[in-house]
Amino acid sequence: MSALAVALARQSESHADCPLFNDPYAQVFIDAALSRGCQLPSDETSERINGIANYASSRTKWFDEYFIAAGAHGLEQMVIVAAGLDARAWRLPWVAGTTLFEIDHPGVLKFKNEALHEHGESPSVSRYVPVPADLSDGWSERLRDAGFDVSEPTAWAVEGLLPYVADGPHLLFDRIHEISPAGSRLAVEAVGTGVADWLSTQGWQVTMIGAQELMTRYGRCGDHSDTDAGMDTVFVNATRTR
């Protein structure tokens, strides 16, 4: 599902009676896309968005809480892999001194930052660093070139990406593991237990929660049937211990 489609889902959640989060920037991206000649999703795609609304909102809330908790535990370096059009750098209450790196395709980051700049918005995080990169080649080198400190414990997030990683998820996590010292954290939306099992063997302490249990926690249920968000989806929260 496209980044714009997910932005539509976040925009809808922000206007719910009891929203799990408020994302005023989702509408900014929608308006910017329309002004650039983009088309809104088809009726079929809109039905799919509605079909996974509770799942998508619960996922966003879980990752939001993950970053807030990481900051509360003293981590000051954050990385979002394939950030898409979520505006966490603008909408979350970051601890002073935090640096947030966002890795994504150049076109996505260019559109995102231009749209927010045109709207007069500034990041809420102390230091925001977009890192244009192809996730299939050389992204970790570009991250270091952008100022990433390999000696500093880091909070990583991998959300909505694994179905699209052509060379397999373990190569992605190999690279994350290589540049993450003890004390680093990693949040992953995964399919099955393979990612959690691999991280456990590499010295990460892992907890998991299934999608249905997560939606129940947030008072959402019943729509987790779309093929993009299957019943075997789990949310992995890992801390590197060695």
UniProtKB/Swiss-Prot annotation:
Signal found in the keyword field: no
Gene3D superfamilies registered for this protein in UniProt: Vaccinia Virus protein VP39
EC annotation from Swiss-Prot or TrEMBL: 2.1.1.-
Top EC class, one word: transferase
UniProt key word Transmembrane helix: no
Example GO biological process: methylation
Binding positions (S-adenosyl-L-methionine): D104, D134, L135
GO molecular function: methyltransferase activity
Domain of life: Bacteria
Pfam families with a match to the protein in the record: LCM (PF04072)
UniProt keyword terms in alphabetical order: Methyltransferase, S-adenosyl-L-methionine, Transferase
Family to which the UniProt record says this protein belongs: Belongs to the UPF0677 family.
General function of this protein: Exhibits S-adenosyl-L-methionine-dependent methyltransferase activity.
Protein name as annotated: Putative S-adenosyl-L-methionine-dependent methyltransferase Mmcs_0580
